[in-house]
Amino acid sequence: QVHCYNSNFPKGMLLRFFVHFYDMEIIEEEAFLAWKEDITQEFPGKGKALFQVNQWLTWLETAEEEESEEEAD
């Protein structure tokens, strides 16, 4: 987030980072979703960052819910 902020949020950069970290299993779903909910002024650019990745985070949240439902069956 801070790197993208300092780079003036190049279009799609943060989304590419998130997808890559997710696909490479570097960061787990719970960490992405916790970041989404963590509203703090400590790091600038959170609003723009969320705007870039919100659709992907929504997909991730939906996929995680479906996976949880399948495991419960």
Swiss-Prot record:
TM helices/strands, residue ranges: none
InterPro entries: ARM-type_fold, W2_domain
Entry PTM: Phosphorylation; hyperphosphorylated during mitosis.
GO MF annotation list: translation initiation factor activity
Record bears the keyword Phosphoprotein: yes
A Pfam family recorded for this sequence: W2
Keywords of the record: Initiation factor, Phosphoprotein, Protein biosynthesis, Repressor, Translation regulation
SMART domains: eIF5C
Domain W2: 1-70
Its job: Appears to play a role in the switch from cap-dependent to IRES-mediated translation during mitosis, apoptosis and viral infection. Cleaved by some caspases and viral proteases.
Similarity annotation: Belongs to the eukaryotic initiation factor 4G family.
Name assigned to this protein: Eukaryotic translation initiation factor 4 gamma 2
The species this protein was found in: Gallus gallus
